[in-house]
Amino acid sequence: MTAFNDRLGALSDAEGRKALAGLRRGLEREALRITSCCQLALDPHPKALGSALTHSRITTDYSEALLEFITPVSGNIEDLLEGLTETHAYTLKHLDGQKLWPVSMPCYVGDVKDIPIAQYGTSNTGRMKTLYRKGLTYRYGALMQIISGVHFNFSLSSDLWPRLHALSGSSLSLDEFISESYFGLIRNYRRLVWVLPYLFGASPAICGSFLKGQKTSLEFEKTAGGTLYLPYATSLRMSDLGYTNKEQASLNISYDSLHDYLQGIREAICLPSAKFAEIGVKVDGEYRQLNANVLQIENEFYAPIRAKRVTRKGEKPSEALARAGVEYIEVRALDVNPFSPVGVEASQLRFLDVFLLYCLLSDSPKSDAVCESEITSNLRAVIHEGRKPGLALSRQGEPVTLKAWLLELFDEFDKLASLLDIDGSDYAEALAQWRMAVEDPALTLSGRVHAAVVEQGMNHGDFVMGLAAKYQDFFLSYPLSPGVEAGFQAEAASSLAAQAEIEASDEESFDEYLKGYFKGVPCALS
């Protein structure tokens, strides 16, 4: 018997199963606005959608054109997706004919200098958000910043933690145990993160225009229509073409404990970068970036998973974690699913439930340099050639085929599904669906995109525009109830009023505001 099986056995009674199934989830989906002429939208964030600074469900990410839809936390997957669908529908009805780009990698961008950085008004808070994005532009270029994805927020039931705490025999307080357990989940997730691009990576091909003279070591093949692809790739979004930060490669952020993690993040925020110093911070009276450190602020740290806690007003993410520990985790390794109108589907979320619970309930040893190297090489292999027949990965120094490893994992996942399926078979069905994609890589999301674009000879841009038009029709005809419509209209108005109130209440200059903000940034744990 393994520790995983022991823990499952201890949770197999009715109360344990109910506690295990009491998961809380949230979604964040990014999507570019595109014009009817297939170009990136260059107009401001639509007023009908409210204030991107203060709206709880509709905001912007890097660009005015890059919408971000945020769901409230929910314990029900169907409710979660219904809410996300309603947000999309309301938005499309107020985009004046514009569509949403339904894949992660952008295409018809035009001149990258024209990509509009997100604007949040004239308040110090809003100006800082825009300046941070301006800094990202100088540091990494605008094109990388408009790559979109889906983030999955996940937390366990408050009823489950006392049972796991008692089962562990830990001498830690319950809050300390919760943080320790979430970091155990994170360590296992990082070892197994390659599973997600294999199943859910959906960017094996890109428009030829995306490279625009970029140097790359990737040996792309080209279709007659100009689409670039790697024959067995899964997620070019997660490759060096996508959202990565070479300056961060030297950072040593530890996931061994909350303390070590916070120490690493705080050191990174205060670590000067010679490369970024060359940009300048304030040149000829105009800011180019918040500072010249490796990270301007904590949000710049790129990772496929993050430990999170809801922040109080004015609180930085690390301060919230230091104050009260980990509250939930954020999965950031998901491509937009082009076969779903909202970029993600229920079977993926059920798989993620099982996958993350497996990471939580399995033993999670601390990492070392050899383990970190293995994590990196396995992920890179799956990103570049995950669908390659017989692809071998490394598991604790020993070679193992991706397929054999995945089938072993799915046998363990099935045990969890049997406990989660209290009234039905939704989890078993989701696992059965994705197990078929282990047996046949053509059934992965990247396999389906490859079939549509490469095997059928369709230009990548045409393929995506066809989906964009289809989903536009779907959302424009989606029936929003009068109450839901009124709710969105009310929040649009109240968010604009809230932004105006913030702007009116500012009393210090922007220079003073920034000085005060960074004065409060500790470079080490006390």
UniProtKB/Swiss-Prot annotation:
Annotated membrane-spanning segments are: none
Output the Pfam families linked to this UniProt entry.
Answer: Glu_cys_ligase (PF04262)
Key word Translocase present in the record? no
Q: Which UniProt keywords are present, listed alphabetically?
A: ATP-binding, Glutathione biosynthesis, Ligase, Nucleotide-binding
Question: Could you tell me which Gene3D superfamilies the record lists for this protein?
Answer: 3.30.590.20
One GO molecular function term?
glutamate-cysteine ligase activity
Pathway assigned to this chain's UniProt record: Sulfur metabolism; glutathione biosynthesis; glutathione from L-cysteine and L-glutamate: step 1/2
Q: Tell me its EC number(s), please.
A: 6.3.2.2
User: Does the keyword field hold Plastid?
Assistant: no
Q: Which reaction does it catalyse?
A: L-cysteine + L-glutamate + ATP = gamma-L-glutamyl-L-cysteine + ADP + phosphate + H(+)
Please give a single GO biological process term from the UniProt record: glutathione biosynthetic process
Q: Which InterPro entries match?
A: Gln_synth/guanido_kin_cat_dom, Glu_cys_ligase, Glut_cys_ligase
Q: Name one GO cellular component term.
A: cytosol
Q: Which family does it belong to?
A: Belongs to the glutamate--cysteine ligase type 1 family. Type 1 subfamily.
According to UniProt, the name of this protein is Glutamate--cysteine ligase
Q: What is the lineage of its organism?
A: Bacteria, Pseudomonadati, Pseudomonadota, Gammaproteobacteria, Alteromonadales
